[in-house]
């Protein structure tokens, strides 16, 4: 299913293909086209990888690239990090499958027509937006 770009808004929750972790890459012995085999790129050890949800924070969505904050499963220590916003599954189960952390400190720009696979939710609720803005302010002040 293709993405309807007219339905992409700031604060939308999207599904993004972030790339293949280096540890999953089979180094070819011949001249195999790596971009053909790994179209979303090969990530180093600490780069965000695989398919994850993200929240669009760009204001100008007509650009080919947009800025997002990725979401991932909540891990031990996330609550102590001021650059992380924790979302409880029980409160947001209409779009989350488990407790989730917004990685505000992993803000990144992506090529929207290549990386975005689908729009999950057209916009997140205002309380989540406020938490993201506060975490951004605390992280980058």
Functional labels for PLM-detected ranges:
Residues 21-35, 41-45, 49:
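Short, Lys/Arg- and Gly-enriched loop/turn segments at beta-strand edges
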Residues 40-92:
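Compact nucleic-acid interaction/catalytic patches
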Residues 10-11:
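Loop/turn positions that initiate beta-strands
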Residues 24, 76-77, 112:
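Residue-level signal for secondary-structure boundary sites
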Residues 1-6, 80-141:
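C-terminal terminal-subdomain/extension
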């Amino acid at each position: 299913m293709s993405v309807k770009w007219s339905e992409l808004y700031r604060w939308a929750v999207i599904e993004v293909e972030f790339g293949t972790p280096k540890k999953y890459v089979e180094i070819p012995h011949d001249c195999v086209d790596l971009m053909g085999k790994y179209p979303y790129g090969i990530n180093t050890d600490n780069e965000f990888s695989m398919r994850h949800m993200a929240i669009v924070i760009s204001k100008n969505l007509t650009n080919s690239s947009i800025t997002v904050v990725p979401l991932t499963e909540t891990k031990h220590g996330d609550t102590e990090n001021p650059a992380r916003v924790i979302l409880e599954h029980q409160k947001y189960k209409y779009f989350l499958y488990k407790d989730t952390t917004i990685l505000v400190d992993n803000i990144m720009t992506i090529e929207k027509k290549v990386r975005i696979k689908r729009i999950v939710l057209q916009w997140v609720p205002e309380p989540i937006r406020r938490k993201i803005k506060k975490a951004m302010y605390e992280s980058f002040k």
